[in-house]
Each structure stands twice: as structure tokens, then as C-alpha cells.
Amino acid sequence: MIAIIGLLFGIILGVVFDVNIPERFSPYMSVAILACLDSVFGAVRANLSKSFQADIFISGFFGNAVLAAALAYLGDKLGIPIYIAAVIVFGGRIFDNFAIIRRLIIEKYKSRQWGD
């Protein structure tokens, strides 16, 4: 629940404050944002599975973002579009986590509905 509240708070802050990111940083920011979203979806999944740990979430949130942006920067300096691989990996993980979240919610709903 903390992850969802944090995500909503971040979205509201992003809408209220007009933050312009220079175009040259957009590949790094996009990969970092995907990494953060991956951590948020992972936290929601862990929370529904009753295995959420705040320290794991926070370290993964910032660690994934920094690592993804650093790899995108390194790839840019080497002339290799590494950020595309990061987008594919994080995108796949986000969809996997979403599928698991969906199943967990449906299973909880069914168990409450039928009183299991």
C-alpha cells in the first residue's frame, strides 16, 4: 500500500510542478523511470504475497534506477544502445508482475466471495 501511495504522490507532484528535463537526458530518465516502476510493481506483488520488506523495496527502487541510468549512459558513450535492452527487460518484468498481481487479486476476490 505504501508503494501505491508513493506512486500516486509522485504523479501528483509531477503534474503540479512543471519540471523540464533536457532532451539529452531523456534516454537515461526513461530507463530510470522504468526501473522505478518495475520496483513499484514488484513491491505491490510482494505486498499481495505478504512478503513485502521496505528496505528491499527502497534499495531496489533507487539501486535499479541508478544502475539503469548508468548502463544507459555507458552504452551511449560506447555507441551501443544498451537502454533498449533495459527497456525490454524492465518492460517484461513489469508485465510479469502485473499478471501475477492480477491473479493474486482475482484469487483473493474469489476466496472472499465463496468464503473459502
Give residue spans per PLM region.
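Charge-biased, low-complexity intrinsically disordered regions
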Residues: 1-32, 36-116
